[in-house]
Amino acid sequence: MRYQISGKQIDIGEALQTHVKTELGVVVKKYAVRPTDALVIFSKSAHEFVCEATVHLSTGLTATAKAHATEIYAAFDACAEKMEK
């Protein structure tokens, strides 16, 4: 699976990228079809971080989720939890 991890007006460190790849890999394993690529975008809105994730599946379906939190890792974890449901 190809990953595209970026930030709008914020730096995305290597540790966060590794965390995203690891956790997102676990989340998408629940789908029966093979995911082809994932796009994760982080941004900051006022006093909180926003994480938007989009995963394209080989069947043509797309799974998306969006979450807000005061910490960037918590924003991603909440986003991944929404995608898992």
Where are these regions (language model features)?
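N-terminal, polar/charged subdomain of small-to-medium soluble alpha/beta proteins
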Residues: 1-85
